[in-house]
């Protein structure tokens, strides 16, 4: 029942990303500075504005976990950690690898209530990114339709959004993106 600092939480999440505590220097005298550096490098500290050594407030613990879900996993290869496969493509994120989650970024073209239901349907078009892969001239993504969305995101219609989902009928979040 001890409280956990943001630094300690970040260390646990780095191990979840694939870092070996010994090889990565997350133990011993310099563990704290190495943890801070790797957590920052992997985006775990984005929007985390709290002391790293004091007890971590819930909102920042949740932010650390959210950031980790979207962070690419790492592997040890050629005497260094990398977040890419041997073929040069990005490793899966924690969300993709362990939870079957997907992300897509595009324009919410439509959002409406489903007939006779308390849920909504949404069309995502002009998809620019899917599971950390950027769309290119030769690699375009098909539009996506999501169903059974429990929350009303009508206010985000016609905006660029990021969707966190599992399958097309399990949407966990829709977030506005800065243009």
Question: Can you annotate each of these PLM segments?
Answer:
Residues 1-140, 144-178:
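N-terminal propeptides
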């Amino acid at each position: 029942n001890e409280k956990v600092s943001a630094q300690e939480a970040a260390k646990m999440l780095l191990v979840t990303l694939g870092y070996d505590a010994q090889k990565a220097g997350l133990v011993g005298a310099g563990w704290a500075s190495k943890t801070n550096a790797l957590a920052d490098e992997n985006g775990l500290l984005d929007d985390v504005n709290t002391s790293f050594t004091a007890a971590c407030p819930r909102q920042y613990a949740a932010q650390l976990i959210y950031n980790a879900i979207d962070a690419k996993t790492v592997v040890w290869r050629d005497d260094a950690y990398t977040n890419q496969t041997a073929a040069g493509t990005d490793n899966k994120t924690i969300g993709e690898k362990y939870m079957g989650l997907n992300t897509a970024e595009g324009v919410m073209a439509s959002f409406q209530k489903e007939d006779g239901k308390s849920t909504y349907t949404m069309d995502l078009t002009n998809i620019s990114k899917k599971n950390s892969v950027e769309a290119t001239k030769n690699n375009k993504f098909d539009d996506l339709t999501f169903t059974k969305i429990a929350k009303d995101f009508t206010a985000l219609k016609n905006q660029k959004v990021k969707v966190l989902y599992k399958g097309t009928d399990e949407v966990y979040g829709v977030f506005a993106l800065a243009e």
